[in-house]
Amino acid sequence: VKTVQREHYRVEKWEAYPLPGAAVPFLVLVPDTASDKNPVPVLFCIPGSDQTKEELAGETSPDLDQPSVQQPGNNAMAFHYVRQGWAAIVVDNAGTGEEGDAERAAGRSSHDYENLARFLLEMDWSWLGYTSYADQCILDWVKTRPWAQKNHIILSGFSLGTEPMMVLG
């Protein structure tokens, strides 16, 4: 969808479609040193219930049009790992961040688990099942990237993000 160059790395915004019409935006941070001749290890990050992928990537906006955070906090795991030469993938939990836009537009919080869980149950999915499936689709895609060390991928989740992380593991 978009690529922005940062100091010593680039941020790529992608969308996965695990189900027809179900767009799952995610961020890919790739160090400038990564290439098909020099693949790098990968960190796959899943935020907590009240975090977004942008926070973990040290970004200030989903559209990447703003400069990155000048001094990201300790939980900006993707940012800190890419600065150490790793690639990092960051995916919001289902119903949060950009996937929670309907809630934000209605003036509520940035997540809507209850309605999403109800809709998913009506389609014979659970929230954890759908979130884990979407993450697995993205993880499978990562393994096809020439810059990724396919045998050196770490999964990390914060709080609620540990649930799909454990399913992926």
Residue ranges and their predicted role:
Residues V1-N38, V42:
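N-terminal cap/lid segment of alpha/beta-hydrolase-fold proteins
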Residues E12, L29, A76-M77, I138, ...:
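Short, hydrophobic/aromatic alpha-helical segments in well-folded domains
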Residues A16-P20, V30-T33, P47-D50, G95, ...:
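Short, flexible loop/turn elements at secondary-structure junctions
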Residues N38-P39, F44-C137, K143:
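Cap/lid segment of the alpha/beta-hydrolase catalytic domain
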Residues H80, V167-L168:
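Hydrophobic/aromatic ligand-binding patch that stacks against planar heteroaromatic rings
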Residues W141-A148, T162:
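Conserved helix-loop functional segments at active or binding sites
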Residues G157-V167:
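Glycine-rich nucleophile elbow surrounding the catalytic serine of serine-hydrolase chemistry
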